[in-house]
Amino acid sequence: MNQRATQPETELSSTVRLTAAQAVVRYLAALRTEHGEPLFGGVFAIFGHGNVAGLGEALYRHRDELPTYRAHNEQAMAHSAIAYAKAHMRRRMMAVTTSIGPGATNLVTAAALAHVNRLPVLLLPGDIFVSRAPDPVLQQLEDSHNGGVSANDALKAVSRYFDRIVHPAQLLSALPRAIRVLTDAAQCGPVTLALPQDVQAMAFDYPASFFAPRVVEFHAPAPLPREIERAAALLRDAREPLIVTGGGVLYGQAAETLRAFAHRHGVPVAETQAGKGALAWDDALNVGGIGVTGGSAANELAHAGDCVLAVGTRLQDFTTGSNTLFKQARLVAINANPFDALKQDAVAVQADARLALEALSAALGDWRAAPQWTTRAHRLAEDWRATVAHVTNTPPDAGQLPREADVIGAVQRSDEASPTGDIVVCAAGTLPADLQKLWRTGAPGGYHVEYGYSCMGYEIAGGLGVKLARPEREVIVIVGDGSYLMMNSELATSVMLGAKLIVVLLDNRGFGCINRLQQACGGAPFNNLIDDCRQGALGAPTIDFAMHARSLGALSEHVANIDELQAAMQRARAADRSYLISIDTDPARPTEEGGWWWEVAVPEVSERAAVVVAREAYERALNARAGDVPKNGEDPTCP
């Protein structure tokens, strides 16, 4: 990250006296993108005694150029900030501040989510007094073995960069380091600057030049020629290659470069969850989602191909089918992060996706995949699109509750411009699997599914962040009852901010996805669906989700079937505020089309016969890794 200062030379030698908190806020407010926009779109804040006097005063002073947003839950507002950055393809971001104690530790889950997904967020939790004079203060964690420990140390494991500021002068080095990590393609992730209460209030004479408006330049590492030549040599020997596109293609602004590469060289493209949308859903070479939650077209090609070109993907188990899907193929990995580029013994190209694809295409020249391979990909892609149309447009039988595929179809039928106009937001349960298979995305950014950490509760908070980033788009949050009950308070925040969301809530009365996985592993239905849980004399309540949403200020309704859902979606699209639609769905009928084996360890010994049978199947699958691998649909799966 380079920062170009734009202040007059006469200001270079002057100083300005500010508190540490004022310095943080003023520095962040001065940063700009190359397009002249503020790098930081704002700060989410929940104030407490650990940050209200210091950061609260500083944020108020700069409330116009660096807006402050109040939320209802610290983890949720961090999710919103992360989603904001993802919606901006990591080119803009937000900061988050909390008090000490529970406010700070509520950030840990969100920080882990940002870390796993390689997404930037700046966390500014308050911390205990450096002076220790009033110890132990309210909410202070005391460690009898280490007097320097605070609850914020829990954030070290889930931060790309962590610093505790014990003197105001340390900000002169800590803040540039923080911005470097947040804007670096290889290191990108959460940054934590812990700000002790007394240090926030301390004044220091800072160089005025430190706060001059400056443009942040995002570092895009160029590929080494020898790495490009090794990758090109491997591809030239291939006849049946497949591209696997990850989030790095979108974050590297390489979607058009990817499309040009694929068509010039006749290589089909399979999508990960993070990479979906890099190629339009109806592009002839888009063979759909890959892996455990992928479609049959991509998985057939991955299992048959002789080379996989992985671009900007972490190659997690849902992409690789627990390392069984394309184990027969040679692997080329383009990734700005060397940790990811070296996975699976790949021929690594550590570089920005756009620059690497351009260089690789130039090195390949007129080389193309075998014509019959490209033709096969076209046919499989067309067949898969027909399958998607059939699955999403075939209504449930009489007396059947709808399933996820039915809901997805109704949502997209409610507006013919949905593939290019809507942004769908989701995170956990059965829905990400069906969305990867079935949602039609026409442009980059239209598919926002958090599937690195698969964090229940991200959905509504994430939707809020997306809407703040893309207010001109219709943001549709599709969420299950389980995730909604875990975290829903930012629906009220969306109403307060005028950041309209459409929330489609599928109520299958419990954790339906894990219930199916439990039974697939031989377990009895237990503690997942509400009916299978321990209950008191009054039984489980019947939850009126529409009424709950209304209590938070949203408009809402409950619908009885798919036709009513499609009509309700049109009312929601026309509404002037957040709108929730709830619908009862079947917990037992997932989309069977597509899919691949996923390794979930089954108990080696059990008194339950079904577990013994499941263990035998699991061992067969493990043994198969040395030869044939499990085929589509052999093992029901979900996150």
Regions picked out by a protein language model, each given a short descriptive name:
Residues 43-55, 59, 381-461, 466-467:
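Active-site diphosphate/adenylate-binding microenvironment
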Residues 18, 22, 225, 252, ...:
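Conserved structured core elements
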Residues 2-371, 410, 414, 500-503, ...:
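N-terminal alpha/beta PP-like core and its mobile active-site loop of ThDP/TPP-dependent enzymes
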Residues 132-146, 292, 341-342, 350, ...:
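Thiamine diphosphate
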Residues 2-4, 11-12, 166-169, 207, ...:
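Phosphate/pyrophosphate-binding active-site segments
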Residues 90, 418-419, 471-472:
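Short helix-loop-beta connector
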Residues 159-162, 392-395, 556:
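Short amphipathic alpha-helical interaction patches enriched in hydrophobic/aromatic residues
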Residues 245-247, 311, 428, 479-482:
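Glycine-rich beta-strand-to-loop/alpha-helix junction loops that act as flexible
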